Swiss-Prot record:
Zn(2+) binds at C254, C265, C267. GTP binds at R249, L250, H251, S252, A253, Q270, E291, G292, R293, T313, S348, K353. Gene3D superfamilies: DHBP synthase, GTP cyclohydrolase II. The gene is ribBA. This is Riboflavin biosynthesis protein RibBA. GO terms for biological process: riboflavin biosynthetic process. It comes from Staphylococcus aureus (strain N315). Catalyzes the conversion of D-ribulose 5-phosphate to formate and 3,4-dihydroxy-2-butanone 4-phosphate. InterPro entries: DHBP_synth_RibB-like_a/b_dom (IPR017945), DHBP_synthase_RibB (IPR000422), GTP_cyclohydro_II (IPR032677), RibA (IPR000926), RibA-like_sf (IPR036144), Riboflavin_synth_RibBA (IPR016299).
Amino acid sequence: MQFDNIDSALMALKNGETIIVVDDENRENEGDLVAVTEWMNDNTINFMAKEARGLICAPVSKDIAQRLDLVQMVDDNSDIFGTQFTVSIDHVDTTTGISAYERTLTAKKLIDPSSEAKDFNRPGHLFPLVAQDKGVLARNGHTEAAVDLAKLTGAKPAGVICEIMNDDGTMAKGQDLQNFKEKHQLKMITIDDLIEYRKKLEPEIEFKAKVKMPTDFGTFDMYGFKATYTDEEIVVLTKGAIRQHENVRLHSACLTGDIFHSQRCDCGAQLESSMKYINEHGGMIIYLPQEGRGIGLLNKLRAYELIEQGYDTVTANLALGFDEDLRDYHIAAQILKYFNIEHINLLSNNPSKFEGLKQYGIDIAERIEVIVPETVHNHDYMVTKKIKMGHLI
């Protein structure tokens, strides 16, 4: 498929056009027509109903939903993607509410600041969806994409979306979407590209605190940051004056290894080795909340159960439905840029960290090997990291 850039899509939306938004291939892997409510024209919903044929919904911000008392359709949402459907509505000035004109009127009234809850009949023929406050950075769905796109065009936070179906009633994917794009001369973007666009446009970290932190390995400055859109907390240890070319360790949090000194892995030993090195040579340790290579603590324990049954650290993650490594280093790159660090000597044995930082514009001048002893308990783990994950150990 041939995708357009986000800026061109925003321009099209602001001109009242409809675009195609495609989600992740591991999610629905489908394309929705998306329009911004404030900019859409009288033909938008008719075009969606005639050409796309899916369910026409109206994503809105939480503020709009709360102001108009748009309560959830069900108390117990069992949708596999957690889509926040509210009760369906028609504006009181409609008749049956189903015509394209009347659904357009209902959608437009959703963003009218003079509208009140009593102005909408329930149930109706338009289906509002409530977007997460942090948009696609919190949930990579079409609901959040529509509201984010509306905001990025300077419009009120609401849109209209409709799944694209083929003539035979199946969902349009891949080449079907490309053909639809070409037939109707529409812009087409991905939610992944929208996520990256927002990451580049908006600050993702917020400085919260700085303290002196005496440790068994020396006294460090400890900085606390908060990830703006995920609310994750990130700790940074530094030693000495921060330089533009700095020694840096990215360390993924490992409760079992770092705190309980588990010998299943080498994480705790790597952290101690890195703290000793940074204390002696100066530099920085960025402590990232990426437990279990991004799958979380409880899922890591589930992976350990599988390892006890004969799986290795890679196949266990795959068996649980995860990639072998879910980590992303964009937040780490943001922190480095916060400190004006342009070049780093990276303390790591993991090549994916090099590539992960390079894609966000961080220059890695040198790799510093982190040497830790192997134990009888982590031998198989170390072998798997070397053979299957390419670690330089």
